Regions:
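N-terminal nucleotide-binding beta1-loop-alpha1 segment
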Residues: 1-19
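Generic preference for hydrophobic
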Residues: 3, 25, 77-78, 158, ...
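A short, conserved acidic/glycine-rich loop-to-beta-strand motif
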Residues: 127-137
Length: 308
């Protein structure tokens, strides 16, 4: 199996943060989104991965190389220019690297999760659908486009497109296992969407796509300022069961941070490298990300890096 992490998005919902930092490089305490996703790939036993990049591609490439080396992954970079190619076009551009008769693990680069994906992979290998979409129960009031599945777990519709039948709506996690037949459905040039142009096309041809529901574990689409804030605070409190991600019981201060001796630090709190904290209260439940500056009280929140 080979994996691909989609890391070429513009991160428009996270501006102005993403004007200087690409979304996959956004800090999550001492890590980044991209590093967490590459670690997820490695935990599944995958040893080869493609990472695409477009916006601030040099930063994405630098993090990907460092993390892949640390995790023992063979890395391929797929640089998209002059425009990002979407989730489908990214696969087409990287097809020479991906299309080798193996299952492809594809995941969105803005997902943070501790879900155990092994049962989904085992089911995909046993049932051999064209694709297996990893799903979550749909939260009440959520504004995500639904993926509807029948009682056997077969996908009927994606965002209302597909085939007839009575289905139950679920939330797509941004993670799927694919066979190369999916790539055959995508336009050979330009941007495209794997779900709307790949999966929906297969559904209309009567091909089987599986929806595997995982209710356990935590999952977040870290694509908005509020969800990015929540992800950092959840990591601070150890709510994600990830290796090396135990709760911060006290106060962590990086040796590279500068903290005023008059600052009042209250646990739990995390202060990253390059951060500066003045003579103010910080905590409880405070995350000061690398390069951030705090000159006013901070509690139950996240201080972001300066963008000047």
């Amino acid at each position: 199996m080979i994996a691909m992490v989609l890391a070429a998005g513009l991160g428009t919902r996270l501006r102005p943060l993403t004007e200087k930092i690409p979304k996959p490089a956004l800090p999550l305490l001492g890590s980044t989104l991209l590093e967490e996703n590459l670690a997820l790939v490695a935990r599944l036993g995958v040893r080869e991965v493609v990472v695409n990049a477009h916006h601030l591609a040099d930063q994405v490439a630098r993090i990907a190389r460092s993390a892949a080396d640390r995790l023992g992954l063979k890395l391929h970079l797929s640089i998209e220019s002059p425009e990002p190619l979407g989730t489908g076009g990214a696969l087409v551009a990287a097809r020479p690297l991906l299309d080798r008769g193996e299952t492809i693990l594809l995941l969105n680069g803005d997902v943070l999760t501790d879900m155990d994906l092994r049962p989904a992979l085992e089911r995909h290998r046993a049932e051999r659908p064209a694709a297996t979409m990893v799903l979550r129960p749909m939260p009440a009031g959520a504004d995500f486009a639904p993926v509807e599945i029948d009682r056997e777990g077969a996908v009927l519709r994606i965002a209302g497109l597909g085939r007839e039948g009575e289905g139950v709506p679920h939330l797509f996690s941004g993670i799927h296992f694919l066979e190369s037949v999916v790539l055959d459905e995508l336009p050979t040039e330009g941007p495209s969407c794997i779900n709307r142009q790949g999966h929906v096309s297969l559904l209309r041809k009567g091909k089987r796509i599986l929806g595997h529901v995982i209710a356990d574990g935590r999952w977040s689409d870290v694509g908005t300022p509020e969800r990015y804030r929540e992800a950092n605070l959840d990591l601070l409190e150890g709510r994600y069961e990830l290796p090396g991600r135990e709760a911060i019981r006290g106060v962590f201060v990086s040796p590279e941070a500068k903290v005023s001796p008059e600052a009042e630090l209250r646990a739990p709190a995390w202060i990253g490298p390059g951060a500066r904290v003045g003579a103010v209260p910080v905590g409880p439940r405070a995350v000061v990300l690398p390069g951030a500056r705090v000159e006013a009280p901070l509690a139950d929140g996240v201080a972001y890096p300066e963008l000047g």
